[in-house]
Swiss-Prot record:
One of its GO terms (biological process) is mRNA splicing, via spliceosome. Residues 542-705 form the Helicase ATP-binding domain. There is a cross-link at K482, K483, K504, K1166 (Glycyl lysine isopeptide (Lys-Gly) (interchain with G-Cter in SUMO2)). This is Pre-mRNA-splicing factor ATP-dependent RNA helicase PRP16. Belongs to the DEAD box helicase family. DEAH subfamily. PRP16 sub-subfamily. It is linked to Retinitis pigmentosa 84: A form of retinitis pigmentosa, a retinal dystrophy belonging to the group of pigmentary retinopathies. Retinitis pigmentosa is characterized by retinal pigment deposits visible on fundus examination and primary loss of rod photoreceptor cells followed by secondary loss of cone photoreceptors. Patients typically have night vision blindness and loss of midperipheral visual field. As their condition progresses, they lose their far peripheral visual field and eventually central vision as well. ATP binds at G555, E556, T557, G558, S559, G560, K561, T562. The gene is DHX38. Residues 727-902 form the Helicase C-terminal domain. One of its GO terms (cellular component) is nucleus. Residues 300-310 have a biased composition (Acidic residues).
Amino acid sequence: MGDTSEDASIHRLEGTDLDCQVGGLICKSKSAASEQHVFKAPAPRPSLLGLDLLASLKRREREEKDDGEDKKKSKVSSYKDWEESKDDQKDAEEEGGDQAGQNIRKDRHYRSARVETPSHPGGVSEEFWERSRQRERERREHGVYASSKEEKDWKKEKSRDRDYDRKRDRDERDRSRHSSRSERDGGSERSSRRNEPESPRHRPKDAATPSRSTWEEEDSGYGSSRRSQWESPSPTPSYRDSERSHRLSTRDRDRSVRGKYSDDTPLPTPSYKYNEWADDRRHLGSTPRLSRGRGRREEGEEGISFDTEEERQQWEDDQRQADRDWYMMDEGYDEFHNPLAYSSEDYVRRREQHLHKQKQKRISAQRRQINEDNERWETNRMLTSGVVHRLEVDEDFEEDNAAKVHLMVHNLVPPFLDGRIVFTKQPEPVIPVKDATSDLAIIARKGSQTVRKHREQKERKKAQHKHWELAGTKLGDIMGVKKEEEPDKAVTEDGKVDYRTEQKFADHMKRKSEASSEFAKKKSILEQRQYLPIFAVQQELLTIIRDNSIVIVVGETGSGKTTQLTQYLHEDGYTDYGMIGCTQPRRVAAMSVAKRVSEEMGGNLGEEVGYAIRFEDCTSENTLIKYMTDGILLRESLREADLDHYSAIIMDEAHERSLNTDVLFGLLREVVARRSDLKLIVTSATMDAEKFAAFFGNVPIFHIPGRTFPVDILFSKTPQEDYVEAAVKQSLQVHLSGAPGDILIFMPGQEDIEVTSDQIVEHLEELENAPALAVLPIYSQLPSDLQAKIFQKAPDGVRKCIVATNIAETSLTVDGIMFVIDSGYCKLKVFNPRIGMDALQIYPISQANANQRSGRAGRTGPGQCFRLYTQSAYKNELLTTTVPEIQRTNLANVVLLLKSLGVQDLLQFHFMDPPPEDNMLNSMYQLWILGALDNTGGLTSTGRLMVEFPLDPALSKMLIVSCDMGCSSEILLIVSMLSVPAIFYRPKGREEESDQIREKFAVPESDHLTYLNVYLQWKNNNYSTIWCNDHFIHAKAMRKVREVRAQLKDIMVQQRMSLASCGTDWDIVRKCICAAYFHQAAKLKGIGEYVNIRTGMPCHLHPTSSLFGMGYTPDYIVYHELVMTTKEYMQCVTAVDGEWLAELGPMFYSVKQAGKSRQENRRRAKEEASAMEEEMALAEEQLRARRQEQEKRSPLGSVRSTKIYTPGRKEQGEPMTPRRTPARFGL
């Protein structure tokens, strides 16, 4: 280390001297010599080879020639040429001004020459150089001209230009090795942006040439207020130039050489060799052409000499700083060296103006189509009015206009529906609510606010990006972390789907149920049976049953009707002649009661006592008592009209009045009339037994007295706005009070049950030291293993809280229930004749339902019932009994079923409550449209096949037609997708992302085909749940679709219907959809608006439809259903051809033909009507003959007379025996 104490240019950090100062950073000032740099011209150095004399000679010759050329003005000159000429004049003045400036170009060669690659040493001869310059001068004198040559010649010219450029560049490179620096640095200015504004030229205002001014300014550091023009560079020049490249003169090339660095952005250069510009401390990073250097190279020396030591030290510091800047730059550019970092305001302004001119307003395909429609309509109006006349025919007319199909609509009604035949005695529709303006009805329409909030939170939580999970990310893929798929129980080992897996209860019911209440623990099963109220009147009941074929039994909930009646009949010997059947309105009730009775009889479930529900038959050859749903018994009556293998049938919970129950009443009334040995027992928990007795012909009514345990009923003081929140609070209050016993909460539907269960669990987690509570939901769609959990005993010290729909109202005895919380609402299926669809809606319950629910609390001990409505509402706002399902639902399937059972005249069928006339006529009209009924109201072969499918008639028709069209595989998937609720979901906050992903599945012609595409994509992804979540699809709904498809496929196999695929020809699928929904067709009216073809009612495409916002709107569409919200929205829309509608729906539509007149159309319509009238007359004649034959066969009506054959009895038509007196016969 040298002594640096004397050097003031060294920045030094001194240590702390405690005597003189506390500490800090001391920066010594620079010397005056380092503050002010003095630039000195280097001494002239003669060339050893005499090159300086040769260079000055050539320079003088060129200047003389240039002076002569300046006198001749070019026809076209540019601003750049003028600028360069100014630069040349200033150069000339400077060269004449001082002696040091004469050798400036010679002094510019600071760097030592590198070792060149050996090449051709020469350049071109002086003669060729002179000829070339002369040719350029002559060409420039002619000015700029426009060529009208052909494109082919222009391309040749262009290729010659490129060849010439290439040769010229090569010659310049060769020549530059032995020429001056100015010639070696040259290159033509290139630009690729022809129509755009030029990049700004950064020129020093006070500089004559790039060799002066800014490079001689004093060092201003980073904070200098005066910035060099290099610090705001222009965009990097590109390679190409316009067609004038080779037409530039030698002078122009030289000028471009001189002006290049003042116009173009210099690039960064590493300082591995000495660059004198590196001591400029503004860190520009670009190498200027010329500089008047500080140091000078002495003759014969390789190093650099400095005048003072300060200069040397400054130069070394700057070199180190330049090297440091070079290596610290990112990708060769930093904030100062980036050529794209800064631009002048003028350039930015001109660039923005240019882009603004080019900018066009974005127009969507929908808006473009709307504009075209408007323009076409306006043109058509003007032409029609005669204001303007068409002078030219538009040859670019659309082909669609030429081939557009115009449909004519007919209002054809078959003779059996024209009013001459009456089908029902109930003309007005029945509304399932007592007062639509009551508090309960309004709250039911609004729904629960808690449910709405919970739904939004759940969707948001489900759809949020889980950044903390490694699975599915790139890091997770590297580490081998994969997303775990949920196990699919429905898929067997061989990959097939078993849709019965989740519906099988027998496997979960094998275990013996343990007693949980004190009553069940202390008493044996026999003692429990004897404790029931029905045990006291056993003999009286059996006597009445023996004496009468039909008996009405009325008893309160919990009296033992369901479990004991079947056993009493079995013990009385009725099972010797056939099975005892007991119908239940719900599957869970049938399964749980069968299990209880099998335990009381000491057998296994499925042997002596069994049950049969949809998808599962748990019976055997030895079964004597069979519990089943009413739908199962209805299907059995199809195969066997008289139900011969039953000796007694118990219709349990008749007050429920389900659709199947009402149909069974009418059928069993006829069966009992034909079979005197069949016993029919109808049980009900309500007091409307007189209605049942009158229906069956004033049959006896038997009352079972008393209830097992008393129930204390508590009403709410005020109406509850949010029934879910009120139920949660009440359940927590009961639970925390410490009273023993389980809780049963009644809710309207599945979503309400799930929200209530979640809310109870959340509130309990917030409490400290809260007693344990097992929350168990139960509803019909719940898997069987979870449904069976409610019958199992909870661990000791744990209270059960069961949240259920009205599935738990009837025949469901859960041991230990002491508290019932009644929300006061239930879901009912209601038919809307206007849209022709059933809808599940929330309605207030009836008084009969309320009594049933309170009865659940007194089955195994005294209990309490909390009603979340006022006593006034119970008396004034609730109906006495629930409106029967047959009066509020679509009857199409019922009509089909009755027709298939042989009921020709529906008015003669015995309905306990006749259905409304509108519902009946709508259903029969729909069946006639679909071809299930003929013109006389008789069942067709298509209708007989439609009965087998548990589907809406239109979906059944679609499946049947698909077999003929060869696309049954695709239609089976579409029908399955339509049988489940919503497939897609839109979480709040991610609506746009959800819509974008949904658009990927969209098939522009059809929403039905979009559903098909979704299922096929899910299948291709191995039925993945993760794939569903990523694409905002309900995985549970997709699994349900797969189960429905498997079930329908089994039915098709049983009916010997072929399963075929149409491949990628999905037009056949659209035609098949049209065959089932042509009666729900709409045509385009105006812009984006449709109207129903038959009714003229306006319809709108739903925003989620694949056809919504499409550039082309089809003329005709069919839709699956109408949804009434803010507008009449069509859901599940498919574009169809007008000719398909006329072909598949001839009763409504026909194609308008130019050749046919109105008279011909009227004549054809009259012929069709007369043909139908003839058919109807023939059918009426046949019906009359059949009725007369029936009357002859049974003169006493429906009741069959019993004949006792005795000795001496003479039949009609037999000759009398002569030995016997005519008066003596009989006993």
